[in-house]
From Swiss-Prot:
GO molecular function, one term: threonine-type endopeptidase activity
Gene name, Swiss-Prot/TrEMBL: PRE3
Listed name of the protein: Probable proteasome subunit beta type-1
CDD domains in the cross-refs: proteasome_beta_type_6 (cd03762)
Source organism (scientific name): Encephalitozoon cuniculi (strain GB-M1)
UniProt-annotated catalytic positions: T11
Amino acid sequence: MMSNEKEMTGTTIIAIKYDDGVLIGADSRTSMGAYVSSRVTDKLTQITDKIFVCRSGSSADTQMISSYLRMYLSMYSQLEDSIPQVQRAAALASKIIYENPSLLAGLIVAGYDDKPRVFNISLGGSLTERDWAIGGSGSAFIYGYCDVNWRSGMSLEEGIRFVRNAVSCAINRDNASGGCIRMSAISRTGVQRYFYPGDKVLQ
Protein backbone atom coordinates (compact mmCIF):
# COMPACT_ATOMS: atom_id res chain seq x y z
CA MET A 1 0.00 0.00 0.00
CA MET A 2 1.35 3.40 -0.96
CA SER A 3 2.03 5.94 1.78
CA ASN A 4 0.55 9.43 1.51
CA GLU A 5 3.25 10.91 3.73
CA LYS A 6 5.44 13.57 2.17
CA GLU A 7 9.20 13.25 2.15
CA MET A 8 10.31 15.72 4.80
CA THR A 9 13.56 17.50 5.39
CA GLY A 10 12.83 17.40 9.12
CA THR A 11 15.85 19.11 9.67
CA THR A 12 18.31 21.49 11.23
CA ILE A 13 19.27 24.52 9.14
CA ILE A 14 21.31 27.52 10.23
CA ALA A 15 22.77 30.70 8.75
CA ILE A 16 25.02 33.23 10.48
CA LYS A 17 26.87 36.38 9.55
CA TYR A 18 30.63 36.35 10.12
CA ASP A 19 33.20 39.08 9.55
CA ASP A 20 33.54 38.57 5.78
CA GLY A 21 30.22 37.06 4.77
CA VAL A 22 27.56 34.48 5.56
CA LEU A 23 28.00 30.88 6.69
CA ILE A 24 25.15 28.40 6.23
CA GLY A 25 24.85 24.82 7.45
CA ALA A 26 22.49 21.86 7.64
CA ASP A 27 22.21 18.19 8.48
CA SER A 28 21.41 15.73 5.69
CA ARG A 29 18.56 13.44 6.80
CA THR A 30 15.20 13.22 5.01
CA SER A 31 12.38 10.97 6.14
CA MET A 32 8.83 9.81 5.44
CA GLY A 33 7.27 9.21 8.82
CA ALA A 34 9.55 6.79 10.65
CA TYR A 35 11.31 5.75 7.42
CA VAL A 36 14.63 7.51 6.72
CA SER A 37 14.59 7.96 2.93
CA SER A 38 18.04 9.56 2.64
CA ARG A 39 21.00 10.25 4.90
CA VAL A 40 22.91 12.43 2.44
CA THR A 41 20.42 15.07 1.22
CA ASP A 42 21.87 18.48 0.37
CA LYS A 43 19.54 21.03 1.97
CA LEU A 44 21.70 24.03 0.97
CA THR A 45 20.41 24.95 -2.49
CA GLN A 46 22.33 27.48 -4.56
CA ILE A 47 20.03 29.73 -6.63
CA THR A 48 22.55 32.33 -7.85
CA ASP A 49 26.32 32.68 -7.60
CA LYS A 50 26.03 34.14 -4.09
CA ILE A 51 22.49 33.38 -2.87
CA PHE A 52 21.46 30.11 -1.19
CA VAL A 53 18.23 28.68 0.19
CA CYS A 54 18.41 26.51 3.33
CA ARG A 55 15.41 24.16 3.11
CA SER A 56 13.20 22.63 5.80
CA GLY A 57 9.74 21.12 5.45
CA SER A 58 8.46 19.13 2.47
CA SER A 59 11.29 18.20 0.11
CA ALA A 60 9.05 18.60 -2.95
CA ASP A 61 7.68 21.98 -1.85
CA THR A 62 11.05 23.45 -0.93
CA GLN A 63 12.71 22.17 -4.11
CA MET A 64 9.90 23.67 -6.19
CA ILE A 65 10.27 27.07 -4.50
CA SER A 66 14.05 26.98 -4.94
CA SER A 67 13.72 26.10 -8.64
CA TYR A 68 11.27 28.95 -9.19
CA LEU A 69 13.55 31.42 -7.41
CA ARG A 70 16.51 30.29 -9.52
CA MET A 71 14.54 30.74 -12.75
CA TYR A 72 13.10 34.13 -11.76
CA LEU A 73 16.40 35.58 -10.57
CA SER A 74 18.18 34.37 -13.70
CA MET A 75 15.59 36.11 -15.89
CA TYR A 76 15.70 39.23 -13.72
CA SER A 77 19.49 39.38 -13.93
CA GLN A 78 19.41 39.17 -17.73
CA LEU A 79 16.57 41.67 -18.23
CA GLU A 80 17.86 44.23 -15.73
CA ASP A 81 21.55 43.57 -16.41
CA SER A 82 22.20 43.58 -12.68
CA ILE A 83 23.15 41.19 -9.91
CA PRO A 84 20.09 39.90 -7.97
CA GLN A 85 19.80 41.10 -4.38
CA VAL A 86 19.34 38.68 -1.49
CA GLN A 87 16.35 40.66 -0.22
CA ARG A 88 14.57 40.28 -3.57
CA ALA A 89 14.99 36.50 -3.43
CA ALA A 90 13.77 36.37 0.18
CA ALA A 91 10.76 38.59 -0.51
CA LEU A 92 9.71 36.41 -3.45
CA ALA A 93 10.06 33.23 -1.40
CA SER A 94 7.99 34.80 1.37
CA LYS A 95 5.28 35.80 -1.11
CA ILE A 96 5.10 32.30 -2.60
CA ILE A 97 4.73 30.66 0.82
CA TYR A 98 2.21 33.23 2.09
CA GLU A 99 -0.01 32.97 -1.00
CA ASN A 100 0.09 29.16 -1.05
CA PRO A 101 -0.76 28.04 2.50
CA SER A 102 -0.75 24.36 1.50
CA LEU A 103 3.02 24.54 1.00
CA LEU A 104 5.01 23.09 3.88
CA ALA A 105 8.19 25.12 3.69
CA GLY A 106 10.33 26.95 6.22
CA LEU A 107 13.33 28.60 4.58
CA ILE A 108 16.42 30.64 5.28
CA VAL A 109 17.56 32.76 2.33
CA ALA A 110 21.14 33.90 2.79
CA GLY A 111 23.91 35.32 0.68
CA TYR A 112 26.13 38.24 -0.19
CA ASP A 113 25.31 41.21 -2.44
CA ASP A 114 26.83 44.46 -1.20
CA LYS A 115 26.97 42.97 2.31
CA PRO A 116 26.10 39.73 4.15
CA ARG A 117 22.33 39.11 4.39
CA VAL A 118 20.33 36.49 6.31
CA PHE A 119 16.52 36.26 6.01
CA ASN A 120 14.32 33.82 7.91
CA ILE A 121 10.99 32.79 6.34
CA SER A 122 8.55 30.93 8.59
CA LEU A 123 6.04 28.26 7.55
CA GLY A 124 3.38 30.97 7.20
CA GLY A 125 5.57 33.19 5.04
CA SER A 126 6.59 35.87 7.55
CA LEU A 127 9.94 37.43 6.64
CA THR A 128 12.56 38.76 9.05
CA GLU A 129 16.18 39.78 8.55
CA ARG A 130 18.51 38.46 11.23
CA ASP A 131 22.18 38.33 12.14
CA TRP A 132 21.65 34.59 12.54
CA ALA A 133 18.72 32.29 11.88
CA ILE A 134 17.86 28.66 12.58
CA GLY A 135 15.02 26.47 11.37
CA GLY A 136 13.63 22.95 11.20
CA SER A 137 12.76 20.47 13.92
CA GLY A 138 16.27 20.57 15.39
CA SER A 139 16.20 24.32 15.95
CA ALA A 140 14.32 23.91 19.24
CA PHE A 141 17.36 22.14 20.71
CA ILE A 142 19.94 24.79 19.75
CA TYR A 143 18.19 28.14 20.18
CA GLY A 144 19.76 28.72 23.59
CA TYR A 145 23.21 27.71 22.35
CA CYS A 146 23.01 30.12 19.40
CA ASP A 147 21.60 32.95 21.48
CA VAL A 148 24.43 32.72 24.00
CA ASN A 149 27.37 31.90 21.73
CA TRP A 150 26.86 33.88 18.52
CA ARG A 151 28.64 37.23 18.43
CA SER A 152 29.23 39.88 15.83
CA GLY A 153 32.53 39.85 13.95
CA MET A 154 33.39 36.16 14.23
CA SER A 155 36.12 34.95 11.88
CA LEU A 156 35.35 32.23 9.34
CA GLU A 157 37.12 29.65 11.51
CA GLU A 158 35.09 30.69 14.55
CA GLY A 159 31.90 30.61 12.48
CA ILE A 160 32.63 27.10 11.21
CA ARG A 161 33.22 25.89 14.76
CA PHE A 162 29.98 27.58 15.91
CA VAL A 163 27.85 26.08 13.11
CA ARG A 164 29.41 22.63 13.44
CA ASN A 165 28.74 22.62 17.19
CA ALA A 166 25.15 23.79 16.71
CA VAL A 167 24.22 21.25 14.03
CA SER A 168 26.02 18.45 15.90
CA CYS A 169 24.03 19.29 19.02
CA ALA A 170 20.76 19.14 17.07
CA ILE A 171 21.69 15.84 15.40
CA ASN A 172 22.44 14.32 18.81
CA ARG A 173 19.08 15.40 20.27
CA ASP A 174 16.56 15.56 17.40
CA ASN A 175 15.36 12.24 15.97
CA ALA A 176 14.45 13.93 12.66
CA SER A 177 17.95 15.37 12.13
CA GLY A 178 20.96 13.25 11.24
CA GLY A 179 23.51 12.18 8.68
CA CYS A 180 26.40 14.46 7.80
CA ILE A 181 26.94 18.22 8.11
CA ARG A 182 27.23 20.47 5.07
CA MET A 183 28.29 24.12 5.18
CA SER A 184 28.86 26.88 2.65
CA ALA A 185 30.62 30.19 3.27
CA ILE A 186 29.47 32.99 0.94
CA SER A 187 31.58 36.14 0.73
CA ARG A 188 32.61 38.89 -1.67
CA THR A 189 35.14 36.56 -3.26
CA GLY A 190 32.85 33.58 -3.83
CA VAL A 191 31.66 30.36 -2.19
CA GLN A 192 33.59 27.81 -0.13
CA ARG A 193 32.02 24.47 0.79
CA TYR A 194 32.70 22.28 3.82
CA PHE A 195 31.63 18.73 4.59
CA TYR A 196 31.72 16.65 7.78
CA PRO A 197 30.66 12.98 7.42
CA GLY A 198 28.60 11.28 10.08
CA ASP A 199 31.62 10.01 12.01
CA LYS A 200 32.88 13.61 12.32
CA VAL A 201 29.67 14.91 13.92
CA LEU A 202 30.62 16.06 17.41
CA GLN A 203 29.28 13.96 20.28
